[in-house]
From Swiss-Prot:
InterPro entries according to UniProt: Aldolase_TIM (IPR013785), Thiazole_synthase_ThiG (IPR033983), ThiG (IPR008867)
Subunit comment: Homotetramer. Forms heterodimers with either ThiH or ThiS.
Family: Belongs to the ThiG family.
Superkingdom in the source lineage: Bacteria
Protein name per UniProt: Thiazole synthase
Any one GO CC term of the record: cytoplasm
Subcellular location: Cytoplasm
Keywords of this entry: Cytoplasm, Schiff base, Thiamine biosynthesis, Transferase
Family annotation (HAMAP family): ThiG
Organism of this sequence: Novosphingobium aromaticivorans (strain ATCC 700278 / DSM 12444 / CCUG 56034 / CIP 105152 / NBRC 16084 / F199)
Amino acid sequence: MTDNNDTWTVAGRTFTSRLIVGTGKYKDFEQNAAAVEASGAEIVTVAVRRVNVSDPKAPMLTDYIDPKKITYLPNTAGCFTAEDAIRTLRLAREAGGWDLVKLEVLGEARTLYPNMIETIRATEVLAKEGFLPMVYCVDDPIAAKQLEDAGAVAVMPLGAPIGSGLGIQNKVTVRLIVEGAKVPVLVDAGVGTASEAAVAMELGCDGVLMNTAIAEAKDPIRMARAMKLAVQAGRDAYLAGRMPTRKYADPSSPLAGLI
């Protein structure tokens, strides 16, 4: 059973669930809210440019997912320059008072890989303005350290391209990021199914963020529940410490004293 005292902290805020879920691609707000509940997530990430969180004349996500119970993490999805991302998060802070934010500055529409030069520049500006940026980045330990130095409160390397469902393509570099970071590390993007979420946690990550894997499942609510259990299982496996790998067999029962 997962230890309820096994919490994680980002920017002075402590959480029990290590699964962060998105709010895009769902059939409607009702389904989104049900998936969040099934996942056990305490944080949801919201695309400021796409999801209504401030216009009371239109359906609002906050009517379905209570911001008093769930932490909202505004993100800059769809931004391709540092200026766009900074402006978007300034608007988010004006609308809802949010300072803990998710920064992503994309390099191109085909791969949705981050533009790290623009990302680092935006991180520096946002940190100076009092934001607490959790930052989407490439799976590169050097880039992750640069982001940390620039003021990132968490680094979020991609496992694979956003929405691809390809799973974690480079376990070695993700592990290196975990080993070198002094801030939380969360895999962001690429997870497609529960086993891949477990892998992220087994690598020592502090958490996993996902959207498409749940929203595009045939049964999003069931998948949300599966992801919750997978993240817990992966974390427990990491804390337990896996057995060493061996070249040859090692019998489970002693060979001495056989009849």
